[in-house]
Amino acid sequence: MAERRVPFSLLRGPSWDPFRDWYPAHSRLFDQAFGLPRLPEEWSQWLSHSGWPGYVRALPAAAIEGPAYNRALSRQLSSGVSEIQQTADRWRVSLDVNHFAPEELTVKTKDGVVEITGKHEERQDEHGYISRCFTRKYTLPPGVDPTLVSSSLSPEGTLTVEAPLPKSATQSAEITIPVTFQARAQLGGPEAGKSEQPENK
């Protein structure tokens, strides 16, 4: 099976901005965007000329430059991405769960489906209180033994769930049949090979 990526993200797109006269003095309050980085400059310029005045505010240069923005954008683009791989002998799913501790993650199998759940209770951050939860389900390939499914969490926050594929699915269906050699059978039984002798009188 070919590699398949399943990204998801949230798009910011307010159709109007009642606080544009208040910006940028209080921009920090309204531009938190719940952890999402601002739109890249070229998107902002395109949207501001799209015929929808006020659709997107002009962004200050500081908002789109610098390592902090690059790190935030990199994290957002890499967050929440699920990657499924299937090799000749293994099936594997990798999922970015960097916001969750190991004890906040649950991996279980039921009816040929792997279910990954993450949840942490409400906690305080620099902007207030936040809670997160998610559930992802993946169908196991036919014949996979659910008791052999294993999972591991990397220090970078990548959860890997994998299982060996059954032998019947990984081995070729081609079977070599040995050829045995037999001498040609003699017709008429063992006595047929004897030449008949004329009877002497």
Curated annotation (Swiss-Prot):
InterPro entries xrefs: A-crystallin/Hsp20_dom, ACD_HspB1, Alpha-crystallin/sHSP_animal, HSP20-like_chaperone
GO biological process terms held by the UniProt record: anterograde axonal protein transport; cellular response to vascular endothelial growth factor stimulus; chaperone-mediated protein folding; intracellular signal transduction; negative regulation of apoptotic process; negative regulation of oxidative stress-induced intrinsic apoptotic signaling pathway; negative regulation of protein kinase C signaling; positive regulation of angiogenesis
Residues in sHSP domain copies: 72-180
Sites bearing Omega-N-methylarginine, chain numbering: R12
Main location: cytoplasm
Similarity remark: Belongs to the small heat shock protein (HSP20) family.
Function noted in UniProt: Small heat shock protein which functions as a molecular chaperone probably maintaining denatured proteins in a folding-competent state. Plays a role in stress resistance and actin organization. Through its molecular chaperone activity may regulate numerous biological processes including the phosphorylation and the axonal transport of neurofilament proteins.
Protein name, as recorded: Heat shock protein beta-1
Species of provenance: Bos taurus (Bovine)
